[in-house]
Amino acid sequence: MLAKLLTKIFGSRNDRTLCRMSKAVDAINQMEPAMEQLSDEQLAAKTVEFRDCIAQGATVDSLLPEAFAVVREASKRVFGMRHFDVQLMGGMVLNDRCIAEMRTGEGKTLTATLPAYLNALSGKGVHVVTVNDYLAQRDAENNRPLFEFLGLSVGINLPGLPAPAKRAAYAADITYGTNNEYGFDYLRDNMAFSPEERVQRKLHYALVDEVDSILIDEARTPLIISGPAEDSSDMYRRVDKLIPHLIRQDKEDSESFQGEGHFSVDEKSRQVNLTERGLMLIEELLVKAGIMEEGESLYSPANIMLMHHVTAALRAHVLFARDVDYIVKDGEVIIVDEHTGRTMPGRRWSDGLHQAVEAKENVAIQNENQTLASITFQNYFRLYEKLAGMTGTADTEAFEFSSIYKLDTIVVPTNRPMIRKDLADLVYMTEKEKIDAIIEDIKTCTERGQPVLVGTISIEKSELVSGELEKAGIAHKVLNAKFHAMEADIVAQAGQPGAVTIATNMAGRGTDIVLGGSWQAEVAALESPDEQQIAAIKDAWQPRHEAVLAAGGLHIIGTERHESRRIDNQLRGRSGRQGDAGSSRFYLSMEDALMRIFASDRVSGMMRKLGMKPGEAIEHPWVTKAIANAQRKVESRNFDIRKQLLEYDDVANDQRCAIYTQRNELLDVADISETVKSIREDVLKTILDSYIPPQSLEEMWDVQGLEHRLKDDFDLDMPVAQWLDDEPGLHEEILRERVLEQMLAQYQRKEEIVGSDIMRNFEKGVMLQTLDSLWKEHLAAMDYLRQGIHLRGYAQKDPKQEYKRESFAMFAAMLESLKYEVISMLSKVQVRMPEEVEAMEQQRREEAERLARQQQLSHQAPVEELTQGSAAAAQEGRKVGRNDPCPCGSGKKFKHCHGKLQ
């Protein structure tokens, strides 16, 4: 109550911020006449002037009013578009490390040019982040003339570009690209083997378009660079055949309930749990299939990977549906983004889930992958010195932006008042009744020439509505993941009189729906149109535009509520842009996922009390409130999941930063011999301490063990026992120094043979390779730890604290292993004189020829075939270890057989 009273007196924080900014807007407007007097050359020269000011110590913020006035004037001359006052405010919000909520059609792309120009003046680079490649390319090309007029360079960071092109894109003053590509480039840079391979500069300023989609919807999806692991595709197929024998039951077994089914599904948490009966059946089926031994348990440690396969197969069949979560195209399973409805080629689910879905759909199963490097968007974007974002819908997630990213959300007013009518939800008992009502609404709209945009939550639902429209004889276009390439064209013309467009979720975000259709799109479709053709297209568009306005503008139909209110608002926001007329309505049924899982009891109780008849809809504030509460519950749950994910990932992030910092220091230093020397002393001290404890009696020394360890791990023949026999009074400290001297002397001899330059490069290469290999293993170990850590809660321990403690111990152990393995490898490496190398090569060739003759004489497969076979095996991911049996069937180890030929 008090808070409301104070807000009434002093205004909200948002109002006070806008009031402060309006003074800066007045200052910019006062500069406009002076800017108009400048010639093009004088206006462009302002950039050099600003850069000189920054070089002399001026801050970017102190230049804001004049810099914004320069961009506004340049935009008038280049595009014929003048930034509105509210767009200037939006630019200030973005410069202040905040999120600007600007409604659809308010010109976010043009607004972004203001802070992008201002922050590019420092010369540290600006990254404009978009949700897909099409928008990155479109925005870069659209804004390039403006920035180049002002003397700034523009780069586009697209997937698949060669390293020199990427480096050039990042070296530009302003770089456009997708969130995925920026993140992957960061990971790739931290896997580089020379400074020249890196493409990114220091991360300075990120300006994120559709910030809610990237920082919230995709926050739970880590970016992973992976390499192939062992092949287990056959096991996925064998286990997949067993799943159809299992029967679902409604709820989980408990003391009071024992079901007849084999598994239960928790739709809220998207988990599948085997019942006791199900476990017995699956064990029986696994034994019959010859996958498991009689009498074994699926939960025994030996069958941990088998349990992993069963769980993945069960989830693939029960939780993941074709044309909802994924599509099958050209024999490949492609994930559909649940938030945008777009396909994500190249993305794969982890933990064997993707392979299980491939087995279910009977397509080629690709190898499981092992993580080489990963980062979440939450942690990647927090690496920037300065972060800001813009979207049409951020206010509902303001708390999350503030608590996780330290970004305040400012709602920027619209240039013209919004007059869209948001009609109350209509709730039906069944899905069929709801679809029938939607078709009737569409018919009514098309009869009066009003365009309709129908929003669905999955491909399956969009095709269901499409099928019903076909039956009713209503012409329409479908925009979903299957027709991804036509997205922008379909959306651009969705405002034509009487047009009906079905869109999955918010596919097509970033493209405005113009009432009457886009005349610019019609012009773009023509090959080099002349002035007369353009004028004719504009003249034809004007009456269409007025007819649509008279019919009520664009009508939005939501076929069901999304889990998040924000995504519903995004759908509504496609209508009523720039003060245009428009309307929206959501149609719901008691069979919708959200209603069934979160709101069914309360709402169905209300419907029964109101005496609902088939085909009748309920339209009541109570129902709308119950649905909003259900959505808040889901949003709160999803926020908790993201927050928890971040808390766990922060532990890994600290370690990631430490490893990447160390790795970059290694790359940037030409000579790491001092580091190697220091590590060698540490390693040797640890080994000597374990066999010759400090200040201990000679009887406690394990001299024989020390000799074996030095020989096996460091290829050092140290007659320690002989030294002690020859010098009975040899002191422990002198012994330690002698071992170190011998080790250094052996290493020095190798360096004399190959030269110091080669040895320095070799040291760096060994250090980087070992670091990468151990980091990869550490990531896998962290994954396993993370998956089971929640069980510590049963022992009255805090899983997060346990995870921090254990992961730190694992990290410390990894760093010790790094030291040990680097020194071991450097000590064991054999160096040869050039003539020795040539003699060994000749011997190897003769041995290969002898083996080939032997095999032909004994009627075995020719060598070429066998080597091709092993190469094919390698291509398929079946890497043959040097100590594994040779694939030729000789019974010998690979290194003693065909491994000799490689």
From Swiss-Prot:
It is found in: Cell inner membrane; Cytoplasm. Residues 851-902 are annotated as: Disordered. Residues 892-902 have a biased composition (Basic residues). It holds the Pfam family SEC-C. Its EC number is 7.4.2.8. GO terms for biological process: intracellular protein transmembrane transport; protein import; protein targeting; protein transport by the Sec complex. One of its GO terms (molecular function) is ATP binding. Its cofactor is Zn(2+). It is a peripheral membrane protein. Its main location: membrane. One of its GO terms (cellular component) is cytosol. Zn(2+) binds at C886, C888, C897, H898. SMART domains: SecA_DEAD, SecA_PP_bind. ATP binds at Q87, G105, E106, G107, K108, T109, D512. It catalyses: ATP + H2O + cellular proteinSide 1 = ADP + phosphate + cellular proteinSide 2. Induction: Repressed under conditions of excess protein secretion capacity and derepressed when protein secretion becomes limiting. This is regulated by SecM. Monomer and homodimer. Part of the essential Sec protein translocation apparatus which comprises SecA, SecYEG and auxiliary proteins SecDF-YajC and YidC. Belongs to the SecA family. Part of the Sec protein translocase complex. Interacts with the SecYEG preprotein conducting channel. Has a central role in coupling the hydrolysis of ATP to the transfer of proteins into and across the cell membrane, serving both as a receptor for the preprotein-SecB complex and as an ATP-driven molecular motor driving the stepwise translocation of polypeptide chains across the membrane. PANTHER family: CHLOROPLAST PROTEIN-TRANSPORTING ATPASE, SECA INNER MEMBRANE COMPONENT OF SEC PROTEIN SECRETION SYSTEM. This is Protein translocase subunit SecA. It comes from Sodalis glossinidius (strain morsitans).
